[in-house]
């Protein structure tokens, strides 16, 4: 049988869990604490309202990934944020986009991936920002 100390030691060295320390650094740099209006988190921000909580998620992607797979990056933009909201016990009610692309064709592929995922997950895209460079 594996001892509790061995399990704890394995968790303490897990690179995925160690990466969560980045949240503390980000919150510190932004001056966010547990007393801030929104609760800093990993999957999404939790903002209290009169009916419970609003969950807000956002994801960024590496430029190399977007350049190599623009349609899939668009799909993942929806899927990852949907997953993050679900991970916190919520239900996604809408999406916004922030797309910077080198040209209209690349942007179209990203937006097509987002649109198809939006329909597949039944989450409407309600706004956002697009910029071609």
Positions of predicted regions on the chain:
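Extreme N-terminal cap/leader segments of soluble proteins
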Residues: 1-68, 88, 97, 108, ...
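Alpha-helical scaffold segments that flank or form the walls of functional sites
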Residues: 72-88
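Amphipathic alpha-helical segments in well-structured domains
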Residues: 78, 111-114
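Short glycine-rich or small-residue beta-strand-to-loop segments that form or flank ligand, phosphate
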Residues: 95-102
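Short glycine/threonine-rich loop-to-helix capping motif typified by GTGT followed
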Residues: 102-111
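Short, intrinsically disordered, charge-balanced linker/junction segments flanking boundaries
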Residues: 131-133
